[in-house]
Amino acid sequence: MVKRIIKDIRMKPLDTPKIYYVSRPHYNEGLTAITPIQTSHIAFHFWSNPDRKILHHPDSKCLLEFDLYTCGTLTHRHIERVLHHLTQFGPTHLNLTLLNRNLSLTIDQQSTWDKTEMGWVDWIEQFAK
């Protein structure tokens, strides 16, 4: 998935993705991955047994924190492609923050999605407009 994301957003990998399984402590169990790209990195942690109190939706079964850092340019179309890749995880809730690292660290956009309000694919298409 990470290799396809890098290709879709037209970034250049510096190495292959490194993926690790974390088993302890139990509440932190899941996959951790990082991939360096020419303009920074992509990292994520996928918790398979998170504390239920931190989940935002009653149907949520796991938690994914996905970070794409780049000093390059990402369009809404690029971000739409990344979000489509996350469809395989069956998202139920999303907090999205776009930070501009060009001159300083400023928030360009914050968005929240919940499956009770709108379908995932519909929200992605609306986001990309």
Annotated model-derived regions:
Residues M1-K129:
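Polybasic/polar functional segments that serve as interface/processing modules
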